[in-house]
């Protein structure tokens, strides 16, 4: 890999030529990501080489998203390698985690620091936040209007009436 890098090959060229990722350790993770290697491929190569990635933060800093990393499985493909807690510790924001597919409930349950305000800013609705247990006052403090909360209550009551009749 050092010979490739010192010969001024980009990470894309050895990839196109069919070089194995496990033999491209001289390239920065960022270069490997730009070359088109997935988070799964990079993680598998490090695991196969018995190398330890210092932390998930390295992959994050290489430009992999929470979504990319949340989809990485263990080599036997039976379960996810990186948990929501791992992604939070690596510094991913509530918005990045929402984009990765995590629900408001999962985020609230995983981290007491994810307030109604933070989850609202991440793009969750007042209804979603109410359903996971935030109080009306917390929702108002997060910037939702009283009218929005009244509408949620009205819709909730209408739904209950409908379900009771059918």
Tell where the protein language model's regions lie, with residue ranges.
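Active-site catalytic pocket residues across diverse enzymes, especially alpha/beta-hydrolases
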Residues: 46, 73
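Fold-core signature of tandem repeat domains
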Residues: 1-4, 9-14, 19, 24, ...
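A detector of long low-complexity, disordered segments enriched in serine/threonine/proline
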Residues: 151-166
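Short amphipathic alpha-helical segments at helix boundaries and their inter-helical linkers
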Residues: 54-56, 159
